[in-house]
Swiss-Prot record:
It is found in: Cytoplasm. Keywords: Cytoplasm, Protein biosynthesis. Directs the termination of nascent peptide synthesis (translation) in response to the termination codons UAA, UAG and UGA. Its main location: cytoplasm. It comes from Methanopyrus kandleri (strain AV19 / DSM 6324 / JCM 9639 / NBRC 100938). SUPFAM superfamilies: L30e-like, N-terminal domain of eukaryotic peptide chain release factor subunit 1, ERF1, Translational machinery components. Heterodimer of two subunits, one of which binds GTP. Disulfide bonds: none annotated. This is Peptide chain release factor subunit 1. Signal peptide: none annotated. GO terms for cellular component: cytoplasm.
Amino acid sequence: MAESSTVERYRFRKMIERLENLRGQGTELITIYIPPENRLSDVIAQMREEYSQASNIKSKRTRKNVQSAIEVVMQRLKMVGETPENGLVVLVGTVQDGTKEKMVAELIEPPEPVDRFIYRCDSKFYLEPLKEYLEEKDVYGILVMDRREATIGLVKGKRIEPVKRLTSDVPGKHKAGGQSQRRFDRLIEHAAHEFYQKVGEAAREAFEDVKDLKGIIVGGPGPTKEEFLDGDYLPKDLKEKVLTVVDVGNTDESGLREALNKAEEALKEAELVREKRLVRKFMEEAVNGELAAYGEEVDELLKMGAVEVLLVSEDLEGYKVILRCPECGYENIVTVKEKDEAKKYVEECPECGEAELNVEEIKDIVDYYVELAEQMGSNVEIISTETEEGAQFYNAFRGLGALLRFRPK
């Protein structure tokens, strides 16, 4: 089963946090961002030049480490062969590991295309472009309008794609009075009605086939946007996706950006609302129903395939230690806060008594639960602690819970 977006983001964030803590003694950590259109053979050729130039580094130690890192880069790129679809991020260098040094080599295929070639040599890895991938990349629609024009666009992350611009034939104000004024007012309203219909149709064409459209922002100066939404111009399913209505001064492409800036809080809240609903559903079921579980019970229910959705707090920390008897195969899985606590559980096998249990594996606790859930066909949601519900879930349920498909008897 494919990982949920919350799990992907969690793992990506954890990887970046780990890489952020790595340091070299000198400027000897190499970072390379390779766009998909760049050939790896060209990058290897550039690395040969960098290797030659590195011979000018005065510090013997730094020179040795930089050249060693460049050699590793060239070896790894030769093994990859062709540039992946989204490009490649290469992080190589000698880092401090307590009192020792070790060579680190990470090749990362990013979730989105690398947009420019970057080569850096520093005392830390250059991770800013990677951090940008952690920003929300959900797709939203934007419509800004008044009676003169309307502009429609799509938001993907922080990138705005203008889709369509429409201009109207709605006349301006008229100074005639009496019968002429009333007749002219009717013409204006009729023209506005026709323009709203065109805008509604254009919005339908722009938004209805967008996969996973999270919501729509509507903006503009004055009351036109409200008149449009109050009428039957936007299809019902799209009208239900309108997250917020904002006042903006422009209705051209600059108005799209203005509307997005004003709607940022609403967009953030939309994702948090989804999370809040999920946690509330779990809490209600935990108190009043049978289809929720938490604590040690979750492990067994996961293995039985009874879990529909596994909820894991992003603040959950610790490790799962898998111990096994080399003689009879008896297995014991325990939870520890620190890795070095594992040795406390190395004891005589309680099943056969013929040998000591071996520490077979130590896994990050979140990775353990995510992998187990995926093996059993359960969905996984990583719950933030930014909301009151998320914080309560972590504190009251220790950051681990499950919504069940069924309750075993």
